[in-house]
């Protein structure tokens, strides 16, 4: 399986410590990217989840970005404005937008009582997030607080059965090298 374009802080061992404090040992972090078949029979049947976390208080999909510089809102809600350290600005697709179909798919497949949410996670230590960005766009250091807020938000709802949720999500996963290769080829043609 391929290596994801991440900074070291997200690595499973480091990230697991962040979840231990909230969940004890009752959580699942998928090791590496996860390819799901969310739209069989269409031109783009698969989607890549950078990181999947399943906790007793929710199923979380993280789209990770190793962008440096300042990240600000754009005039287009599906985009973000990145101002590089050298001052050059460009528009990039928002991780929230990239997660939209993945979140929708998981919500359709899992019991409605299990919360499913996503976030854009910026892992570069050289990133500065504009204060007016949505709260689901966060720096790696903000992850523990974001998770605590999700746990508080979902208090009183049915607890997610972590093992069953993992099994349900992985039913739609393709872990093969061929699957990832075909997905990458389709993704390249989509964004030309």
Regions found by a protein language model. Name each.
Residues 50:
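Cell-envelope/extracellular polymer assembly enzymes that use nucleotide-activated donors
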Residues 1-47, 56-59, 68, 87-192:
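Surface-exposed interaction regions that form or flank ligand-binding interfaces
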Residues 77-87:
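Short glycine/proline- and charge-enriched loop/turn segments
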Residues 53-78:
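Active-site beta-strand-loop-beta-strand hairpin of nuclease catalytic cores
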